[in-house]
Amino acid sequence: MHGGGIVRKGHFIVSKIIESNSRDLMMNECIFCRIVKGSLPASVVHRDGFCMAFMDIQPVNTGHVLVIPTDHVAYVADLDEDVGAHLFRIAQRIAVALPRSFMQCEGVNMFLADGVAAGQEVFHLHLHVFPRYRGDRFGFVWNSSLPHIPARDELDTVAENIKKALT
């Protein structure tokens, strides 16, 4: 009996060491973690205990801001709900501030790529908030002649499947 407890405790300790080392490695390798730590420079718009917002160094337009959790989180599925809500509140405040700033933009996009197929390149979750202007030549490609326009019953079936997957 005691041996089993020791093994589990030892496994727990080893798991925590591996988890800690992985987190330390990620903090040293991830460009956004390095920005959070202060080992890389950033033009900071906002910082608190949960998130940080700073200027994108490859902006779509002047005023392009990235909002990130200060803890390393790669994907939306791994993001704490309260931190996610806070992240979006900060992004919303930035979106409201952009048209009031010297840029006086005509619109704002918020964009989050989650996973390789979605175009995620930096695997530290980040929400883009950037000003838009008519004729700024940036846009999401949307094919208006989609090959399949689903019937309502198909949409209902897909909605039910997603609803069941909500946790």
Feature names for model-found ranges:
Residues F12-T167:
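HIT superfamily nucleotide-processing domains
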